[in-house]
């Protein structure tokens, strides 16, 4: 990576501003999945072990008005992080002001402070999300010219807490998580060991047009599953019953198929049901066509076998988007089958592009079998699309 990283800095005795991604799910004030907190530990530990004073910034959820602050405080995160680090995490509970500034000034080497949810600044004019220059300058002033961005999950956004701070410090560098995310995903797409197979699922073609176009140029094969299958089917005149379809994207789907030179591989059967939720009948289609009154909710067994064959010998696999409604046990076989087909390839570099795919791997017990699971759905999608990420572009060149 051509950007400076945290290892390039002298941290001892310095107040180090760090953007992390602690946007974790909470239920009744309890964190239900703390993977993102764990993912930030190597960078935080490196800073404090090298005598730095870590000042952490993160958002949590969306906050547009005062009422949205309920249940969005980072207080539970501070507690969880303190347990993981085995030391106190100072939490003044504010995003600005005299109390926060005093707490930062009182920090000693090796201590950690967590600023309150950066999106609390969105209540008055969306200052965080719109990268308000004064807010970025203020947050930068809390440190000593050093900023570490370790929040890959927001690297595709130009916010005050990443791009704004970067613009107002002497050195803005990548943390270990951001460095690894870029290395795995970008290198997989730009310089893959071949054969390189991409697998794209999810419900909407519209979400992945740019990704499909980029990967058709870079990959040897692009496998399509999930709800967007049926837009591709209908574009070819195949019956789809009541399946999800983006009518306004039929021409796009047809165009992608025509210019794919056979690289784009679609399912050959589906698992269908007579309703999305309160269904009374589930069956496998004879072929591609979905029966009238039914909707496709997963790829079928012939498709799993076809995708297994397409993955044979693959050395690089990037997967983004489940093959079906994996949250329902009736429609998770396709996602499980494809995951198992990926991880059984000898010496394969297997990368999951965050979001629902990551949740599927974790929930279905396959997470530890993959080379890398991204912490950022939107950011990884933009990398797969070949876009430059604002949070990365703002960092200091080596």
Curated annotation (Swiss-Prot):
Which cellular component terms (GO) are annotated to the entry?
A: cytosol
Keywords (A to Z) from UniProt: ATP-binding, Cytoplasm, Glycolysis, Kinase, Nucleotide-binding, Transferase
Q: Which residues bind substrate?
A: 21-23, 36, 59-62, 119, 157
Top EC class for this record: transferase
So, what pathway does this thing act in?
Carbohydrate degradation; glycolysis; pyruvate from D-glyceraldehyde 3-phosphate: step 2/5
The protein's location, in the record's own words, is: Cytoplasm
Single GO term (MF): ATP binding
Cytoplasm listed as a keyword: yes
Its primary localisation, in coarse terms, equals cytoplasm
- In this chain, ATP is annotated as bound at 208, 296, 327, 354-357
**Swiss-Prot/TrEMBL catalytic activity:** (2R)-3-phosphoglycerate + ATP = (2R)-3-phospho-glyceroyl phosphate + ADP
Provide the GO biological process annotations.
Answer: gluconeogenesis; glycolytic process
List the EC numbers from the record: 2.7.2.3
The entry describes its oligomerization and partners as: Monomer.
For this chain, the family text in UniProt reads: Belongs to the phosphoglycerate kinase family.
HAMAP family, A to Z: Phosphoglyc_kinase (MF_00145)
Task: Tell me the protein's name.
Answer: Phosphoglycerate kinase
The species this protein was found in? Streptococcus equi subsp. zooepidemicus (strain H70)
Q: Which gene encodes it?
A: pgk
